[in-house]
């Protein structure tokens, strides 16, 4: 949903796919329609989850209370996969976040297979280790963070060289592009042609929730708009930082100013 909102803010029409449940699901759908975003949700029993993020200013700690949400049946899963199979060659599909109850992470592999066969550009932003099993289907873009790299490769990842090494390992396994979000350290973009790094601008962090979504949505919009990789990475880092410096998603009012603090450089 956050990626859909960011894309729309930047002038990219898109359709929000997924499931909805109860009054919270209806609220989300109504909000998206209010923003003139097309929706294509499967309705299920229960209630769409509400997650709570709390920042304790005194000790600069953030607490995330993530609810389970509704449980999906096998019928719901198959209906969702059917929607994916109806995508057309050249479409872009962004799969982001955690899966509902009743859905095995192996669904990511099936989605990857369908997109590969349909020649759909697949973007994966999820922490499950099954992401590694999706790489043979050559997803267009992965957006991991440093914690996910550590979990996937069962190792400590601490330096920029480490990030680049494991990012390139993902490329070797089949991913086409990597957008690696590094929080206060900025971000890296990698493909088989180049490696770019960018620092984070300074500011008071209010809430890190959704900053990765803002970065990803901005990057996808920039890709569609034909921005250079350097300009796109800079704007994407600024949008993610702008979101971290406020209570909700960025409105892009301060993004241009934040961009002035960001330097993009090509890594060897």
Enumerate the language-model features and the residues they cover.
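Short, conserved phosphate/pyrophosphate- and ester-handling motifs at nucleotide-, phospho-/glycolipid
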Residues: 7, 145, 212
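Conserved phosphate-binding/catalytic region of the ribokinase-like
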Residues: 113, 132, 160-268
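Cofactor-binding loop segments of dinucleotide-utilizing enzymes, especially the Rossmann-like FAD-
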Residues: 19-22, 44, 57, 98, ...
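Substrate-binding N-lobe of the ribokinase-like
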Residues: 1-48, 260-261
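Gly/Ala-rich phosphate-binding loop of Rossmann-like dinucleotide-binding domains
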Residues: 8, 116, 224
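Conserved phosphate-binding/catalytic loop of the ribokinase/pfkB sugar-kinase fold
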Residues: 54-89
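Conserved beta-alpha-beta core of the PfkB/ribokinase-like small-molecule kinase fold
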Residues: 92-161
């Amino acid at each position: 949903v956050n990626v859909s909102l960011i894309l729309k803010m930047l002038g990219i029409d898109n359709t929000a796919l997924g499931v909805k449940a109860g009054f919270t699901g209806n609220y989300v759908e109504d909000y998206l329609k209010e923003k003139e975003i097309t929706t294509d949700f499967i309705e299920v029993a229960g209630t769409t989850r509400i997650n709570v993020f709390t920042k304790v200013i005194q000790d600069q700690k953030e607490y995330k209370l993530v609810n389970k949400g509704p449980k999906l049946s096998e019928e719901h899963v198959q209906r969702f996969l059917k929607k994916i199979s109806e995508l057309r060659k050249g479409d872009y599909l962004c799969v982001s976040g955690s899966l509902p109850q009743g859905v095995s992470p192996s669904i990511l592999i099936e989605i990857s297979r369908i997109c590969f066969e349909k020649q759909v550009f697949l973007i994966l932003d999820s922490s499950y280790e099954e992401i590694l099993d999706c790489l043979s289907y050559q997803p267009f873009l992965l957006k991991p963070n440093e914690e996910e790299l550590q979990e996937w490769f069962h190792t400590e990842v601490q330096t920029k060289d480490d990030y680049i090494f494991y990012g390139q390992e993902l490329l070797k396994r089949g991913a086409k592009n990597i957008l690696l979000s590094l929080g206060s350290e900025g971000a890296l973009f990698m493909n088989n042609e180049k490696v770019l790094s960018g620092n984070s601008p300074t500011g008071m962090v209010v809430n890190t929730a959704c900053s990765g979504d803002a970065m990803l949505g901005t990057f996808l919009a920039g890709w569609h708009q034909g921005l250079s990789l350097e300009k796109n990475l800079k704007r994407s880092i600024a949008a993610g930082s702008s979101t971290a410096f406020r209570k909700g998603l960025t409105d892009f009012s301060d993004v241009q100013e934040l961009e002035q603090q960001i330097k993009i450089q090509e890594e060897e």
